[in-house]
């Protein structure tokens, strides 16, 4: 097997393996867990990690067909899997599982979860990281009304949205009245027609920041919260629309 460094417009050369897309792996997955026995390789870009606490012990890899979550038993994943880095995942021996409408890749499950996390010491058995962080990773522009369950973990951009009036002044995360700790919370943005739910993990470093109320451009991955389609910001990419 030969693996070459990757930059914009360049790819790993993989010999003896069949390259597949995220959509192909979605097609393999059934409710619960499915072992991957073929010599398959998934190539994509890291579109969500723990650099700002937006995920924990996992990262999202996306390609043009969609995205999936890779379960990894490690902290500070961003130090070796930075946003935009290209990865080649050798899937043989891994398990793919559906979890609440999303797709996860990991090891054989030993508990109630669809897959177990890959131990850090085993990561290099499955995951090869390209030499370069891509400067050509671009989200897919999508309208709120077009976002649905088929877009799970797709890396997307929503433009010209603003926080609904009744949520102005709120923080990204609510505080639990009993423990005083932040809890996973949803804030709602609108484009004047449809409403976008943005879900924030309590581990995000901006959990205690006020949600901006300017007309914004939001970039992240499509996720599910309480069985509803939502957006999870990637690297807190919410910026004002240019005048």
Where do the model's predicted regions map?
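OB-fold nucleic-acid-binding modules
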Residues: 8-243
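Sec-dependent bacterial lipoprotein signal peptides
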Residues: 1-7
């Amino acid at each position: 097997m030969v693996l070459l460094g990757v930059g914009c417009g360049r790819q790993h050369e993989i010999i003896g393996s069949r390259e597949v897309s995220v959509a192909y792996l979605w097609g393999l997955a059934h409710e619960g867990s499915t072992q991957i026995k073929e010599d398959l390789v998934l190539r994509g870009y890291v579109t969500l990690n723990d650099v700002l606490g937006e995920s924990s012990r996992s990262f999202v890899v996306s390609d043009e067909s969609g995205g999936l979550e890779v379960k990894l038993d490690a902290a500070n994943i961003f130090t070796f899997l930075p946003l935009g880095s290209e990865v080649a995942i050798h899937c043989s021996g891994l398990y793919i599982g559906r979890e609440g409408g999303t797709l996860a890749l990991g090891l054989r499950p030993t508990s109630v979860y669809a897959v177990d996390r890959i131990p850090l010491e085993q990561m290099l058995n499955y995951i090869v990281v390209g030499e370069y962080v891509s400067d050509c990773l671009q989200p897919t522009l999508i309208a709120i009304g077009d976002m649905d369950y088929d877009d799970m973990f797709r890396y997307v951009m929503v433009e010209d949205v603003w926080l609904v009036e009744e949520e102005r002044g709120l923080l990204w995360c609510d505080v639990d009245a009993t423990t005083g700790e932040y809890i996973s919370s949803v804030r709602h943005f609108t484009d004047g027609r449809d409403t976008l739910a943005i879900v924030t993990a309590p581990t995000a470093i901006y959990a205690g920041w006020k949600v901006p109320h300017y007309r914004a451009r939001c970039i992240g991955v499509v996720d599910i919260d309480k069985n509803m389609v939502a957006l999870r910001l990637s690297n807190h990419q919410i910026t004002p629309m240019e005048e």
